[in-house]
């Protein structure tokens, strides 16, 4: 192959790579506007889309051999693994069958609806014996959905089996998944997947990718090992300065509360705090319910010196008086005007007119079709608060444990753990302390660098490393308590995953604290900002039972691996910001520092991108077990793939020499981090989908 052909091949490969990334991004936004069926027909399942991936695979394979990558075993196997995955996906797209089947109790069925339109027949029949829903003890929250079936083969052989969430029934290459059920529990809906070859080939690609990535990290000739030995990481001469400031709030005293108002005495309220009740499909201490109630209404976990328990008890005992207490937070100025109130706190009676008609009912009729209207959101929030008070007055909010012994009470240890968790605002403390330490230490570090003052191994540096270890341990305690209280791994919603990302950031900072002087300040800053977002987004995260489909150790691993990748990408981004700042200020005098930051970023890029890839495909395995398909082009899946593809480009320094240039590399990783933000926040708030926490 001549040089001209090689250049053409490289340009075609790069152009096609960029085109596919762009097409994927555009498709997610089109899906949000025109719906999933449209993008499936014109993008994901269209011939041109299949052709693009095919050409990319073929040209990529030719390019790999043209570059003689077989001489680098790990790199060669990594690229071959992607080709194997594409082949598996092609087999699935061409020969795989997917459909849905409905079966009534006591009946047999052998026909299913394939691709939503075609009636297809199974080589056997399946009979539904019973459909049941199991619940969490003492609650109405479903723990699992189970279809008990009998498979009847043509030779009269019968096979019994249960199909439930994360429990698939496989028979003669067909896989059955629990999808839905009839409201009267007399029938079940099962998803069907028949793709024995495509799944096997794709899984082979996943395994090959994981093994080659591990091989790359440990191979003596790999770029990762070369970066580990780079002298820039061995001669860092920076130090830290920390001025620790204790942040505290002046407590509101009981004297600030108007004493003329009838209230529930504190001595009785305190004694009731550990009383066990049913709330949000969990057994909780009364303190949890009271705290949620007060925080929902007033925006704070206490009210003018009264504890949350006193607030709830006072509403119960003296409802007529408390209906005229302005403690219902209304943030929307427009809604304040419509309710006729001054300020941001309303009374319960402000929501009803002189004829005792509910004011929000008429408002809702005018805004219910405006999904993005701020007033609509304000009306919904206010209505939830009024509904909460109504439930309390009707006796449906507080439910005691049944006396028949059907529900086992919580142990005293678990009750005390939840009371402690409610009392200590882990997220608030951590984000305030971490951001304060992070900003001060980074400011001092930059001052020292500008002045060329080396202060290596100082007392302040050791203190900083000790403090970030303390922050990690304190954060670990909060995450552990959250998991212990909820009896599950706390990674099932947006708040919990952000908490875990922050934990990963602190963990990485502690792990790499000796590699660069910037690691510890970055660890404090990055974790602090993540915790701030978590705190602002959900100041009162309710602990609820996990959805049945989320009960999977594979899902927990999937989320954990991706969160660690996000944390590393965050460090790389902060490295880029500082490196570009120093380069713009005086690149010659700060050359050593810039080199250290660049090497550190390139070093972290390996585990970050490898974890991203492995996390994506662990998620694909979980999806195949739970939903019957390993890839659905859901917006979150698509943007995770985009993130992986974008960051993977930075490894190709020989094909794209610009990545060897310091400024270009750091600008690239800054722009690339936008894909991480889009994957985590953008999809949730803009695009939606099965993975969205909306």
Model-derived regions, located:
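Solvent-exposed, non-transmembrane regions of integral membrane proteins
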Residues: 1-694
């Amino acid at each position: 192959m001549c040089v001209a052909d090689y250049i053409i091949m490289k340009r075609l490969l790069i152009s096609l790579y960029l085109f596919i990334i762009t097409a994927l991004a555009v498709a997610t936004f089109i899906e949000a506007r025109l719906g999933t069926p449209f993008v499936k027909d014109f993008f994901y399942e269209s011939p041109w889309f299949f052709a693009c991936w095919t050409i990319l695979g073929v040209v990529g394979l030719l390019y790999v051999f043209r570059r003689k990558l077989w001489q680098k075993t790990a790199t060669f196997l990594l690229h071959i693994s992607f080709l194997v995955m594409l082949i598996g996906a092609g087999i699935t797209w061409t020969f795989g069958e997917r459909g849905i089947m409905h079966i009534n109790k006591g009946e047999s069925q052998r026909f299913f609806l394939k691709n939503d339109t075609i009636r297809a027949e199974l080589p056997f029949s399946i009979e539904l014996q019973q459909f049941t829903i199991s619940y969490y003890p003492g609650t109405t929250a479903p723990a699992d959905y189970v279809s008990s079936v009998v498979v009847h083969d043509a030779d009269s052989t019968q096979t019994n089996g249960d199909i439930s969430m994360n429990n698939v029934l496989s028979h003669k290459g067909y896989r059955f998944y629990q999808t839905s059920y009839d409201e009267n529990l007399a029938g079940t809906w099962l998803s069907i997947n028949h793709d024995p070859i495509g799944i096997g080939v794709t899984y082979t690609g996943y395994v090959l990718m994981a093994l080659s990535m591990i091989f790359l990290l440990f191979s003596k000739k790999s770029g990762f090992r070369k970066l580990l030995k780079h002298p820039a990481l061995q001669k860092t001469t920076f130090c830290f300065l920390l001025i620790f400031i204790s942040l505290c709030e002046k407590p509101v005293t009981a004297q600030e509360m108007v004493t003329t108002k009838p209230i529930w005495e504190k001595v009785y309220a305190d004694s009731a705090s550990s009383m066990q009740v049913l709330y949000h499909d969990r057994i909780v201490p009364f303190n949890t319910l009271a705290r949620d109630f007060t925080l929902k209404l007033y925006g704070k976990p206490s009210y003018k010196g009264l504890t949350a328990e006193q607030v709830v008890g006072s509403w119960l005992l003296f409802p007529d008086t408390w209906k005229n207490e302005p403690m219902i937070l209304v943030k929307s100025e427009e809604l304040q005007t419509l309710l006729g109130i001054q300020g941001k706190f309303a009374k319960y009676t402000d929501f009803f007119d002189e004829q005792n008609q509910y004011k929000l009912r008429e408002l809702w009729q005018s805004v219910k079709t405006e999904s993005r209207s701020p007033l609509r959101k304000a009306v919904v929030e206010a209505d939830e608060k009024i509904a909460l008070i109504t439930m309390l007055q009707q006796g449906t909010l507080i439910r005691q444990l049944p006396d028949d012994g059907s529900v086992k009470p919580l142990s005293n240890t678990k009750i005390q753990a939840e009371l402690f968790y409610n009392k200590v605002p882990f997220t608030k403390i951590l984000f305030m302390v971490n951001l304060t330490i992070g900003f001060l230490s980074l400011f001092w570090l930059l001052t020292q660098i500008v002045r060329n003052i080396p202060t290596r191994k100082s007392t302040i540096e050791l203190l900083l490393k000790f403090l970030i270890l303390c922050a990690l341990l304190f954060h670990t305690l909060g995450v552990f308590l959250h998991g212990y209280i909820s009896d599950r791994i706390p990674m099932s919603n947006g708040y919990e995953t952000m908490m875990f990302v922050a934990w990963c950031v602190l963990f990485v900072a502690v792990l790499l604290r000796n590699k660069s002087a910037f690691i510890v300040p970055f660890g404090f800053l990055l974790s602090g900002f993540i915790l701030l977002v978590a705190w602002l987004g959900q100041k009162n995260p309710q602990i609820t039972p996990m959805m049945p489909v989320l009960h999977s150790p594979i899902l927990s691993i999937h989320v954990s691996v991706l969160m660690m990748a996000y944390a590393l990408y965050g460090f790389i981004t902060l490295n880029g910001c500082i490196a570009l700042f120093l380069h713009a200020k005086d690149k010659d005098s700060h050359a050593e520092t810039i080199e250290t930051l660049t090497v550190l970023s390139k070093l972290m890029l390996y585990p970050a991108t490898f974890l991203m890839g492995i996390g994506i495909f662990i998620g694909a395995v979980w999806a195949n077990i739970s939903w019957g398909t390993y890839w659905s082009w859901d917006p979150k899946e698509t943007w995770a793939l985009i993130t992986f593809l974008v960051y993977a480009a930075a490894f190709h320094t020989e094909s794209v020499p610009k990545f060897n240039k310091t400024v270009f590399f750091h600008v690239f990783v800054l722009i690339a981090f936008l894909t991480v933000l889009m994957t985590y926040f953008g999809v949730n708030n803009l695009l939606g989908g099965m993975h969205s926490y909306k």
